[in-house]
């Protein structure tokens, strides 16, 4: 149950500090990577919780995060509450992306219901998502208020054939990020100081992945991708156009440079396989910077929104890491290899910029 809005940042700060002390990071992650199976992992991170396989374990991790952030929402009001509410709305967007994939693979929506996340403040939304929706247009109606429906329809209609889930999901992400940037700009100056770097880092990671994966892997053109640019970040529209015009993934990464990463991967010859390697390396380096910024906001944001959103960012990374570990344990990957896949990654070669 969500508590009444009190804007009690002192109490909320105490809550997130207590939770952060139990977060799976550092040596704790090293230990989890050495576990033998999913049962041991579940006992370590979800003690006393029964789950049915890897997918159910992962779903419970995400649902737990949603429940936690929903409780924190009850301690905020005004622009802080609006901002955290939009962070939670990201999970509604992710629900729609699950259904987009079901459209592409012709899997009945009802079979996807187990993968959808339920938001406590909108208990009926998940059921609505999985019932009777048979088109992209119908899915738009189920997106959270704040998503620009007209923009979504225009972009989708311009690139309807062939149906490309990557592009549809990118349109959803870009539209979500536009609103996220706008809500960040409404925060008080003392809060923007801590929250803005986190938001811009995530959005510019999105920009870079549009080029590295959208162009060099999925074959989308700069004309397809340039309209997805989100204004107000460190990668301007002009710079984004230069990144999209790069002849290979390594050049595109170098053109993004320190706007997204503290380091860039060593330049490699451009072919399909190595382009994917560049994309994976850049994504890891981008999220490594995100973790650094989130920790800085959490530790130095005092009893302000920066601390709350820094913590929320760290929790998202924690969940992503635990999901990665669960997948690797199912596949029988070695502990060293598992650790190399986590955020922040270890043992990566890079050229500093």
Roles of regions detected by a PLM:
Residues 1-353:
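N-terminal domain-start signal
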């Amino acid at each position: 149950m969500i508590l009444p809005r009190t804007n009690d940042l002192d109490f909320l700060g105490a809550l997130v500090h207590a939770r952060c002390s139990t977060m799976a990071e550092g040596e704790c992650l090293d230990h989890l990577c050495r576990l033998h199976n999913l049962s041991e992992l579940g006992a370590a991170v979800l003690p006393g919780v029964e789950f049915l396989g890897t997918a159910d374990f992962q779903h419970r991790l995400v649902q737990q995060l949603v429940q936690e952030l929903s409780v924190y929402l009850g301690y905020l009001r005004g622009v802080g509450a609006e901002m955290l509410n939009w962070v939670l709305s990201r999970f509604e967007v992710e629900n729609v992306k699950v259904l987009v994939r079901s459209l592409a693979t012709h899997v009945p929506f009802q079979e996807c219901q187990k993968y959808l996340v339920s938001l406590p403040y909108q208990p009926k939304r998940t059921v609505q998502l999985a019932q009777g929706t048979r088109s992209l247009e119908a899915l738009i109606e189920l997106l959270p208020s704040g998503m620009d429906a007209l923009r979504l329809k225009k972009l989708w209609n311009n690139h309807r054939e062939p149906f490309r889930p990557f592009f549809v999901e990118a349109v959803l992400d870009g539209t979500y990020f536009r609103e996220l940037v706008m809500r960040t700009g409404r925060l008080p100056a003392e809060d923007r100081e801590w929250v803005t770097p986190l938001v811009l880092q995530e959005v510019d990671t999105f920009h870079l992945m549009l080029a590295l994966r959208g162009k060099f892997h999925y074959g989308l053109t700069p004309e397809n991708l340039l309209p997805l640019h989100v204004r107000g970040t460190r990668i301007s529209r002009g710079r984004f156009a230069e990144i999209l015009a790069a002849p290979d993934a390594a050049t595109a990464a170098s053109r993004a440079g320190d706007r997204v990463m503290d380091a860039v991967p060593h330049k490699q010859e451009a072919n399909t396989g190595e382009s994917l390697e560049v994309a994976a390396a850049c994504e890891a380096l981008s999220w490594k910077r995100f973790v650094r910024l989130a920790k800085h906001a959490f530790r130095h944001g005092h009893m302000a929104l920066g601390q709350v959103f820094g913590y929320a960012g760290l929790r998202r990374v924690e969940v992503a890491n635990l999901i990665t570990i669960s997948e690797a344990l199912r596949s029988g990957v070695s502990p060293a290899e598992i650790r190399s896949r986590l955020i922040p990654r270890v043992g990566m070669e890079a050229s500093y910029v």
